[in-house]
């Protein structure tokens, strides 16, 4: 994209097609903290794509990297007494779980379909489990594992959505029903957002490939209209009579871009970041570019708090960030404690294993020395 071209032209074309504005009922009450997540896809110069996301929570979700092999039999457990949808994974998947469950909150399959679960508190409206058959029902936290395990493209996922319902049930480790929505991207660059609304799964094509949290995706797209003046180019000096007013330093074209950690602000900022970033070849160059962008959305402990106190519990922070190279099938992760990016490739794993595999993420608390010991 040319430097002189405002990065908002993409979003404006989308809005011109008629993106509807969804107004949320005023009586809607948020019962959980609005945990932050930010996701995006970067195109490369050679037709590849890299997906990146952060995972924020106010309490430890005990995530581990796992590999779910081909033919692994999975069941979405609706309650202790009720089994939901059962399926056998068609494709192997690598990703991050939570609470030691064999379920993915983020991941990529061997065909390059990648995506994640992002928090959507106060807006998710799931299907009532009493109104649908259990054998067609998925919990909110099992939907991504089902999608990545069974499909290779976002078109296939869209076609299969009518066969399942995502039902509102309590997640035992959390103690409440987590409100979430989903982002999915395939190796061709196609992207969709799936949101549970009015008991149904609403699908949006995602021309920008970005997603954060509440409110709904179409609201975020409409909100971009407030920022159509932003561009990566510095503004020209302003001449007033005999005076020339120069911008104060670099970045004047982005003056006014929101810098806080709220979902609407992060949506605007990550859109600006990916659409103005210069494309590079796929592989490690694109991965490093994605890492630089992710660093701009890293939330340290203490920046986001529900109340003024010295207790870490409830302070939203970036527990981990992931990058999926969808062309080369490499999945990377770095954690709050371990900032070195670690990668796993499908070719290094037994994709036909009988059990799902937990992959240990090395921990290096100290910085690595510049001069290596002989």
Description of each model-found segment:
Residues 110-111, 148-156, 283-287, 326-328:
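A short, structured loop/turn motif at beta-sheet edges
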Residues 36-50, 58, 169-170, 177-178, ...:
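C-terminus-biased signal that marks the final domain/tail of proteins
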Residues 30-36:
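Sec/Tat signal peptide C-region and signal peptidase I cleavage site
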Residues 154, 158-196:
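Aromatic- and glycine-enriched pocket-lining scaffold segments that form the walls
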Residues 13-25:
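Sec-dependent N-terminal signal peptides
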Residues 36-135, 168, 373-374:
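A contiguous strand-loop segment
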Residues 128-164:
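Compact, glycine/acidic-enriched structural inserts
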Residues 1-14:
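N-terminal secretory signal peptides that target proteins for export/translocation
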């Amino acid at each position: 994209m040319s430097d002189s071209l405002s990065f908002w032209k993409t979003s404006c074309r989308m809005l011109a097609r008629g993106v509807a504005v969804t107004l949320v009922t005023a009586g809607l009450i948020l019962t959980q903290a609005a945990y932050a997540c930010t996701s995006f896809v970067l195109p490369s110069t050679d037709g590849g794509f890299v997906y990146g996301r952060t995972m924020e929570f106010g309490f430890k979700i005990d995530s581990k990297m796992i590999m779910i092999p081909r033919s692994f039999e999975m069941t979405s457990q609706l309650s202790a007494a009720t089994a939901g949808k059962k399926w056998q994974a068609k494709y192997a998947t690598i990703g991050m779980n939570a609470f030691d469950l064999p379920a993915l909150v983020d991941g990529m399959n061997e065909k390059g379909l990648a995506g994640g679960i992002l928090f959507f508190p106060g807006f998710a409206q799931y299907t009532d489990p009493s109104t649908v058959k259990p054998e067609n029902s998925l919990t909110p936290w099992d939907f991504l594992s089902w999608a990545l395990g069974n499909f290779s493209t976002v078109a296939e996922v869209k076609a299969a959505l009518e066969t399942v319902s995502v039902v509102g049930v309590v997640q035992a480790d959390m103690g409440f029903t987590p409100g979430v929505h989903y982002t999915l991207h395939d190796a061709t660059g196609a992207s969709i957002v799936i949101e549970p609304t009015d008991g149904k799964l609403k699908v949006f094509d995602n021309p920008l490939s970005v997603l954060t949290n509440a409110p709904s995706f179409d609201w975020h797209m409409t909100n971009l209209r407030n920022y159509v003046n932003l561009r990566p180019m510095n503004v020209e000096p302003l001449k007033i009579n005999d005076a020339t007013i120069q911008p104060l330093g670099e970045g004047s074209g982005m003056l006014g871009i929101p810098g806080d950690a709220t979902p609407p602000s992060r949506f605007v900022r990550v859109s600006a970041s990916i659409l103005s970033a210069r494309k590079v070849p796929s592989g490690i160059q694109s991965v490093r570019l994605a890492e630089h962008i992710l660093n701009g959305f890293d939330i340290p402990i203490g920046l986001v708090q529900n109340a003024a106190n010295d207790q870490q519990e409830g302070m939203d922070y970036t527990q981990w960030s992931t990058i999926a190279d969808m062309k080369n099938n490499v999945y990377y992760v770095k954690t709050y404690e371990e900032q070195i990016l670690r990668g796993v490739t499908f070719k290094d794993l037994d994709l036909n294993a009988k059990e799902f595999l937990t992959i240990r993420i090395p921990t290096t608390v100290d910085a690595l020395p510049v001069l290596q010991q002989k």
